[in-house]
């Protein structure tokens, strides 16, 4: 059995250790080869671990950290004051080889900046991108990036994202010759900002990329493409809007039929139908695919939603496990070398 070690920023996110500790124990229970370095304040973490299964604790080590980077801190200020923080120490453990990957629900900008500074981007990559894999209505999966790491992107960055996304779809998701599209306000070639049109022109002439053109936001879940590329501002708004709609939809399904005066048999029928529909669409629940990979780095770094619950954070940990096991950074580096020019 091969040991796999991850470093977790236990203090990051909206709920900190109240989420990360139970999620860690859940992840350890479901994966016997997993070892975790829980980075945070020992005085805060110890009480939450006191009643944990001693067998699980044999594969968990608390690494002390003096501080935590606030979720609303400006990235530049957070990075300057990051020494001794749980996020930075978790990344340093990954950089030094004590861990094979890092998971944090903390400040996205700070995580991006620190990861770029400590872990370093792959050759040929200007800036890493946040990527996730979401389910689509055809029963397949769609790789989407960037989801917020880079608010503004030039055409070169969009092309790099397209290459990384295609590699991810082919090497990890298992899609042969994945289709790649750019997210735009229309499918016509004349639509969109200059950077999008310039990226489209490059991708059309890149034989290694199966570029299919522009898609609009309403195609996010249709399965028309295997990789959808956009800048971080658009990607973040698009994904969170979709997640919000899905959460409301599932919530309405679960609550429908609970009130009002109905015959008993109608209530039973309603609940039966309700369970079937919730089960049918449950895979769209954002908690089931929490965890965005900071793609383009030399090691695995996963960003969890700040508001993740324990189950969702455990999913992010599993995302990191899969990325490490499938050697995502190495596979991307090998493919990038053949497609993109190396940076000076």
UniProtKB/Swiss-Prot annotation:
Keywords: Cytoplasm, Lipid biosynthesis, Lipid metabolism, Phospholipid biosynthesis, Phospholipid metabolism, Transferase. It comes from the Bacteria. Pfam families: FA_synthesis. One of its GO terms (biological process) is fatty acid biosynthetic process. Pathway: Lipid metabolism; phospholipid metabolism. Disulfide bonds: none annotated. It is an enzyme of class 2 (transferase). It catalyses: a fatty acyl-[ACP] + phosphate = an acyl phosphate + holo-[ACP]. It is found in: Cytoplasm. Its EC number is 2.3.1.274. One of its GO terms (molecular function) is phosphate:acyl-[acyl carrier protein] acyltransferase activity. GO terms for cellular component: cytoplasm. InterPro entries: FA_synthesis, Phospholipid_synth_PlsX-like. Gene3D superfamilies: Isopropylmalate Dehydrogenase (3.40.718.10). Homodimer. Probably interacts with PlsY. Belongs to the PlsX family. Catalyzes the reversible formation of acyl-phosphate (acyl-PO(4)) from acyl-[acyl-carrier-protein] (acyl-ACP). This enzyme utilizes acyl-ACP as fatty acyl donor, but not acyl-CoA. This is Phosphate acyltransferase. The lineage of its organism: Bacteria, Pseudomonadati, Pseudomonadota, Gammaproteobacteria, Enterobacterales.
């Amino acid at each position: 059995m091969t040991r796999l070690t991850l470093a977790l920023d236990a203090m990051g996110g909206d709920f900190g250790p109240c989420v990360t500790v139970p999620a860690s124990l859940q992840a350890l229970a479901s994966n016997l080869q997993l070892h975790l370095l829980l980075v945070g304040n020992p005085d805060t973490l110890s009480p939450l671990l006191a009643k944990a299964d001693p067998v699980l604790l044999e594969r968990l080590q608390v690494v002390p950290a003096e501080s935590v980077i606030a979720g609303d801190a400006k990235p530049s200020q957070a990075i300057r004051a990051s020494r001794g923080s749980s996020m930075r120490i978790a990344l340093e453990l990954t950089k030094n080889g004590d861990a094979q990957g890092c998971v944090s629900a903390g400040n996205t900008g700070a995580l991006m900046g620190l990861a770029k500074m400590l872990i370093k981007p792959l050759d040929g990559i200007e800036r890493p991108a946040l990527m996730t894999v979401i389910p689509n209505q055809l029963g397949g999966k769609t790789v989407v990036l960037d989801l917020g790491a880079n608010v503004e992107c030039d055409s070169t960055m969009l092309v790099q994202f397209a290459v990384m996304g295609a590699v991810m779809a082919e090497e990890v998701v298992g899609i042969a010759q994945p289709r790649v599209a750019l997210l735009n306000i229309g499918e016509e070639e004349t639509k969109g900002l200059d950077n999008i049109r310039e990226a489209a022109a490059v991708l059309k002439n890149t034989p290694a990329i199966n570029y299919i053109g522009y898609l609009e936001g309403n195609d996010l879940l249709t399965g028309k493409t295997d990789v959808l590329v956009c800048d971080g501002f658009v990607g973040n708004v698009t994904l969170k809007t979709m997640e919000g709609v899905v959460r409301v939809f599932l919530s309405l399904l679960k609550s429908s039929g609970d009130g009002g005066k109905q015959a008993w048999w109608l209530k039973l029928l309603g609940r039966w139908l309700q369970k079937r529909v919730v089960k049918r669409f449950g895979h769209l629940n954002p908690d089931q695919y929490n965890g965005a990979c900071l793609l383009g780095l030399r090691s695995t770094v996963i960003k969890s939603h700040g508001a993740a619950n324990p189950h969702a954070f455990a999913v992010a940990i599993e995302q990191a496990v899969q990325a490490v096991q499938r050697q995502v950074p190495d596979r991307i580096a090998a493919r990038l070398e053949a497609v993109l020019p190396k940076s000076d």
